């Protein structure tokens, strides 16, 4: 008899507080990660936090660094070369989504742990197992492994432009439609469904909706509210063993925009707008979702995304092709141009 086995990989430590740059070494020692570390950062995040963390780590570890500018397979390969040549035991990603995604995928391919040290709170990739990597000109979502620890310094994240925090709210409200799509796939395709993971995902969304006015204040408490929701959402995906609890048709819409729009907006911003439309298609209270995004100052239409309405329509019609195996409210054949235009107009997206 074949027995069902479900693997859940979760962060072993989550540290949320102030002035945590010197705590990375303590976490690494506690988790017995090893002596050789590769720290990844971008030009900006090196100055914001990376340089100070690196200096402190050198007191206890052998440290190598890699400066990266985008989440690409080329940069993943660069990291893998350093890991092999320098016998790296663990990685540290200091930055936003791109840096953490490269660290995440490189650690997975090399089978070494990594610590996530986010400098923005713009999406739930800071704690999830999935990496969004650009390869051959297009961004693709790749299953990897979650961080062994997440260290979120409120003081650092607070200094990022508020736009990133609002984008984090957009990524969180998308859990509402993602779970609906997951339930749909479970009923129609018999896909595995975890009630626990779905509940945790929905709780993350409800948390930011409830605290929208506090989040808009853009202070330490705002950051804490969003970060807790993002981490909970990432854990929900780890429990599910897939991105299903937090990624549905609204994410496919965002990925489609990434592929066709000359200047895409932030991931969370696009997902938030996509959620308004997908909530309408699901028969959910899309007006409440739109109101939440307005309350936190996130985009709710094409003009605020600074994307031509034509690309919104096109993205809606091709979204179902981004991941054909992922069943959503868009169905197997997707939306017609007429249906896409109607949904976007009714919801005020165009």
Swiss-Prot record:
The keyword ATP-binding does not apply. Pathway: Membrane lipid metabolism; glycerophospholipid metabolism. NAD(+) binds at residues 97-101, 119-122, 128. Its EC number is 1.1.1.261. It comes from the Archaea. Its cofactor is Zn(2+). One of its GO terms (molecular function) is metal ion binding. GO terms for biological process: glycerophospholipid metabolic process; phospholipid biosynthetic process. Pfam families: Fe-ADH_2. It is found in: Cytoplasm. Zn(2+) binds at residues 171, 251, 267. GO terms for cellular component: cytoplasm. It catalyses: sn-glycerol 1-phosphate + NAD(+) = dihydroxyacetone phosphate + NADH + H(+); sn-glycerol 1-phosphate + NADP(+) = dihydroxyacetone phosphate + NADPH + H(+). The keyword NAD applies. Substrate binds at residues 124, 171, 255. Catalyzes the NAD(P)H-dependent reduction of dihydroxyacetonephosphate (DHAP or glycerone phosphate) to glycerol 1-phosphate (G1P). The G1P thus generated is used as the glycerophosphate backbone of phospholipids in the cellular membranes of Archaea. Belongs to the glycerol-1-phosphate dehydrogenase family. NCBIfam families: PRK00843.1. This is Glycerol-1-phosphate dehydrogenase [NAD(P)+]. It comes from Thermococcus sibiricus (strain DSM 12597 / MM 739).
């Amino acid at each position: 008899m074949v027995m069902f086995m479900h693997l859940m990989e979760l962060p072993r430590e989550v540290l949320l507080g102030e002035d945590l740059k010197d705590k990375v070494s303590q976490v690494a020692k506690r988790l017995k990660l090893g002596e050789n570390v590769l720290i990844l950062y971008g030009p900006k995040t090196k100055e914001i936090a990376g340089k100070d963390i690196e200096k402190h780590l050198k007191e206890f570890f052998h440290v190598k660094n890699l400066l990266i500018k985008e989440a690409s397979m080329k940069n993943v390969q660069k990291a893998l070369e350093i890991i092999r040549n320098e016998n790296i035991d663990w990685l540290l990603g200091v930055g936003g989504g791109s840096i953490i995604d490269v660290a995440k995928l490189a650690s997975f391919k090399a089978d070494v742990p990594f610590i996530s040290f986010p400098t923005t709170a713009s999406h739930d990739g800071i704690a999830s197992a999935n990496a969004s990597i650009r390869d051959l000109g297009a961004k693709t979502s790749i299953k990897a492994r979650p961080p062994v620890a997440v260290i979120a310094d409120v003081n650092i994240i607070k200094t990022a432009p508020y736009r990133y925090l609002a984008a984090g709210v957009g990524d969180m409200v998308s859990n509402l439609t993602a779970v609906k799509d997951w339930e749909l796939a479970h009923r129609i395709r018999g896909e595995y469904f975890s009630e626990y993971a779905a509940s945790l995902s929905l709780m993350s969304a409800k948390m930011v909706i409830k605290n929208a006015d506090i989040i808009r204040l853009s202070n330490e408490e705002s950051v804490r509210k969003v970060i807790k929701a993002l981490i909970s959402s990432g854990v929900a995906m780890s429990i599910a063993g897939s991105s299903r609890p937090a990624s549905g048709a609204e994410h496919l819409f965002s990925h489609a925009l990434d592929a066709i729009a000359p200047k895409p907006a932030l991931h969370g911003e696009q997902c938030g707008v996509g959620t308004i439309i997908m909530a309408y298609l699901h028969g959910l209270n899309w007006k409440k979702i739109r109101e939440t995004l307005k309350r936190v100052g996130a985009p709710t239409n094409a003009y605020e995304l600074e994307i031509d309405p034509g690309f919104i329509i096109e993205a809606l019609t091709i979204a179902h092709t981004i991941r054909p195996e992922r069943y959503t409210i868009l169905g197997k054949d997707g939306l017609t141009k007429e249906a896409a235009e109607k949904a976007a107009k009714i919801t005020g997206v165009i």
